[in-house]
Amino acid sequence: MEEHNKNINRRDFLKIVGISAATTTAAATLYSCKQKDGVIPGGSTSTPVPTDKMTYRTSVAQKDRVSLLGYGCMRWPTVPSPDGKGDMIDQDAVNELVDYAIAHGVNYFDTSPVYVQGWSEKSTGIALKRHPREKLFIATKLSNFSNYSRENSIAMYRKSFEDLQTDYIDYYLLHSIGNGGIEAFKARYIDNGMMEFLLKEREAGRIRNLGFSFHGTVDRLYPFPAG
C-alpha cells in the first residue's frame, strides 16, 4: 500500500466506511416472546405478537429496506456437548428463533467470527440458509483483535463467507474500532493493507456496505486528527 494511505484522518475514515453504514443492532429477546400460550417464564403473560407491525428504514445508498429491530447473534442458546466437554450451540433452537424473528418482520442479522466461541457465524448461516437470501441483510465483522497480519485477517474474512453460506455480505463492519486508539486501528486495518483489500472487495460486490461497530465514548470513536 502506498505510504499516503497509511496516514488517515477523520474525514478520510468517514469517507471510506460511510457514517451511515455504522449500524447499531438491538439484541432481540424474541425467544422469551415465543412461549406456549403466550406465557413468559416468571409468571407474567403476554399478548400475541403481531406479524405485520415491524418498522423499516430505507438506506440512502442501497435503498435497502431494513427492519428497525435487528437480531444480534452474540449469544445463541447452547446445550451440553454429547462428549461432556463443554457446550455446543442448540441448532434447533437457533432455527426456531430465526424463523420466529423473520415471521415477525426482522430481516437484519448481525454476527461475528468471535461470537459464541467462534460458532455463531456457522450456526447463523445454517439457520438463514433456509430462507430466501435476497430478503435478508447479513452483517458480520472483521474481528482481528489479536493477530493483525494480512494473512490472518483475509483468512478470517473468507471464512465468514464459508460459514454464513453466502457469496456476498450486506454489511461488513470493522469490529469495535476505538479500542486501543489510533495505533490499534492502523495496525488492524491500515498498515496491513486490509482497508485497501476491503475496498476492492466492495468494488467487486462481495461487500455491499462497508462500515464499523463501536463501543465507548466519542473521544474514542474519533481518535483521528480532524483534517
What are these regions (language model features)?
Residues 59, 71, 109, 124, ...:
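Conserved, mostly hydrophobic/aromatic
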Residues 1-12:
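N-terminal secretory signal peptides
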Residues 73-89:
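Acidic/histidine-rich helix-loop elements
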Residues 125-138, 194-200:
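Alpha-helix-loop-beta-strand connector modules within alpha/beta enzyme cores
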Residues 29-70, 83:
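C-terminal segment of N-terminal export signals and the immediately downstream linker at the start
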Residues 61-63, 125-133, 161-165, 225-227:
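Acidic (Asp/Glu)-rich catalytic clusters
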Residues 80, 149-227:
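Glycine/proline-rich, positively charged
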Residues 111-127, 182:
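Glycine-rich, proline-tolerant flexible connector loops at the mouths of alpha/beta enzymes
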